[in-house]
Regions:
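Selective recognition of hydrophobic, aromatic-rich stretches within alpha-helical transmembrane segments
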Residues: 7-8, 12, 51-81, 109-146, ...
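Intrinsically disordered cytoplasmic terminal tails of membrane proteins
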Residues: 2, 6, 208-214
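Short, hydrophobic transmembrane alpha-helix segments
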Residues: 40, 44-56
Length: 214
């Protein structure tokens, strides 16, 4: 079943976080192996580069990998089947991903150094950076940061984002309770859920573009 695409400036009937969870589960129904494989690939590569040069590897490549992983999760939420090569798309636009990774990390870290609350505010406001960037890489890192902030705080969606963080935590804890094996399903599910949140925020925005759902 498809929802009608967003047209003009008519407000989009944004899914609730629980509806996003349900849609994400449905989107993964026949693609669990792909989603789990991509998540394991991301985890292994991230762990390897994180051990290089006291974290220098993560600084250098973390942005490109986040770009590619988020793109695969967005595609899964949209009912598409991402190719494994999509995971490495971030290296085609390496500089913007590096800048976005550094700026996001520094801003959030400064927020937590000052006080916990500013750190949480920054983390919520910049939570959509790599989703924006993977959709519009040609517009660069600065645009991605500003657009992420606009979609979350400026548009008044901060509680929805925070709610998704809490729901994701519950899903992860549920995976742990399932003899630990459930984590292999919970982790990609959470990744698709957070990608879906981005799509819902974007579609609900008066300046967003069309996306069709399955």
């Amino acid at each position: 079943m498809r929802r009608a695409p967003y047209l003009g400036r008519k407000p989009y009937d944004m899914r609730s976080n629980f509806d996003i969870l349900s849609h994400s589960w449905d989107a993964l129904r026949s693609k669990w192996l792909l989603a789990i494989g991509l998540t394991l690939l991301h985890g292994v590569i991230s762990a390897v580069i994180g051990s290089v040069g006291m974290g220098i590897g993560n600084i250098a490549l973390g942005g490109a990998l986040a770009f590619g992983y988020n793109r695969t999760m967005v595609q899964l939420y949209r009912g598409q089947t991402p190719a494994v090569e999509t995971y490495f798309d971030g290296f085609r636009t390496y500089l913007p991903t590096l800048i976005a990774f550094l700026l996001t990390g520094v801003i959030v870290l400064m927020g937590f150094v000052l006080l916990i609350i500013p750190g949480i505010i920054a983390a919520i406001g910049l939570s959509q950076v790599f989703y924006v960037l993977q959709d519009q890489p040609e517009r660069g890192a600065e645009f991605a940061l500003k657009e992420s902030w606009r979609l979350t705080w400026t548009n008044g969606n901060m509680w929805k984002v925070f709610g998704m963080m809490l729901l994701s935590l519950l899903v992860f804890l549920g995976g742990l309770l399932a003899l630990g094996v459930g984590v292999f399903f919970a982790t990609p599910l959470i990744s698709v859920m957070t990608a879906g949140l981005y799509d819902e925020l974007r579609l609900n925005d008066a300046q967003g573009g069309p996306v069709e759902f399955v």
